[in-house]
Amino acid sequence: MKLVEKVTEMGLQIEMICPDHGIIWRKDPSKIINAYVEWSKQVPKRKAIVIYDTMWRSTETMAKAIADTLALEGVDAKPMHLRRCHKSDIITEVLDTAAVIIGSPTLNNHIFPSIGSFLTYMEGLKPAKKIAAAFGSYGWSGEAVKTINSHFETMGFDIIDPGLRVKYVPDKTGIEACQEFAKKIAHAIPA
C-alpha cells in the first residue's frame, strides 16, 4: 500500500507492470493496481473457502457437506480440492474470504502432505482478518485437526471451533455433525 501511495503522489504514468515473478501487464495496468490495493486491504466478504484433500473420499464427503450447508446458510462457499486446484487459485480465493476451513485425513499421525505444504505456503503470505476451522477423517488417531489448528494459531486466525473429526467414513451422524459444524461457522461470519 505504501508503495502504491508513493507512486500515486509522484504522479507517474504507469504504462506497464513488470514483476520479478508473474505475468507482465501491458494493457490497463490500473486494473491490476486497483486489484492489489483491494487485496492488500484484506477486507473479508461473507464468503468461506473449504480447502481439503482426501485419501478415500471421507474428508471430501465432509467438505461437500460443510460447503453445501454454508451455502444454505447464505454464505458464498467454495470447496477446493488441493490436488485438483492450483494453490495460487486457492490463495486468490483466501484473499477476500472471511472463513478459511481446512480438512485433512490423518496419515501416519500427521496431516496429509498436500495440506502441510499448502499451510506452509499460506503462512508465508500472511493472510489476515480470518476466522478458521479444521475438520478431518481418521482411522485410529486423528491428529490432523490439531495440527491444522496449530497452523491457524501461527497465522493469527480466530479459531471458531476446536475442530470436527469423523472416524472412518461419515455416516448419517457424521454428515449431521458436518452440517452443525458449518452452521456454527456461518453464524460466526459477519453479515
Placement of each model-derived feature along the sequence:
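Glycine-rich phosphate/diphosphate-binding loop of Rossmann-like nucleotide-binding domains
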Residues: T59
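Short acidic-aromatic active-site loops that bind/stabilize oxyanions
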Residues: Y52-W56, D171
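Active-site-proximal loop/helix segment associated with metal-binding centers of metalloenzymes
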Residues: M1, S40-V43
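FMN-binding flavodoxin-like domain, especially the glycine-rich phosphate-binding loop
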Residues: M1-I24, A65-L82, I90-A191
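C-terminal accessory/connector segments of nucleic-acid motor ATPases
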Residues: I14, Q42, Y52-D53
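Membrane-embedded alpha-helical bundles that constitute the cytochrome b-like, heme-associated redox core
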Residues: N34-S40, Q179
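Interdomain/boundary linker segments immediately adjacent to catalytic/signaling cores
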Residues: P29-I33
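Conserved beta-strand elements of the Class I
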Residues: K47-I51, A133
